[in-house]
Amino acid sequence: SFLSSKYSLSGKSFNQIIDSLQREKYINWKKLIEKNDFSNFSKKITEASFKYPYANRKARYALIRGKSKNIKIDSAYFKYRDKLNYNDEELSFFEPYISYLMSYLSIEALEKDETFYSAKNNTNFNIKRIEVIENKIKNTKLKNILARAVAYEEIMNFNNQISHEKFLESYSLIDPNQEYFNEIIGLNKSLMQMRAGRPLP
């Protein structure tokens, strides 16, 4: 696709392309809401439908480079974050919003000189993402949805089974939604039973 071919550009050039595309979408969106009697929620959803996918493009660009690259310390690159809401409960089940927040968590969880592709299957990285949720996300509903998503990624990684208990201990410390927590515990137990030589659940 057009944007996929632009990830090799500098941060400044990539930003300019995304900003230009977003401005075009914003202008069309303004025309749309001026011609229609949209509710405030409809306005929010229609704007979020292009705002957060473009923000996610910027976040993914940074993730590809990881903290081993200058992009992480380039505060100008991350200016787009200033216009985003990280605790919007009304968008808690809106996929583009959650996808962006998951990318944001991953960027924040990376250590110095660590790349996303080397870290993403690591239990310690998922524990750090849980810690970022606890420290950065204030809305309880959003916090639970994001933590559940991270927990699923961890538990479904069979290579990490030996470390799942360590992760679950960290997950339990953020006072998760009990239904979600029980769901994750049950999933982990079932997957553990599927290991070689053990009966299926």
What are these regions, as identified by a protein language model?
Residues 1-201:
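Oxidative protein folding and maturation machinery
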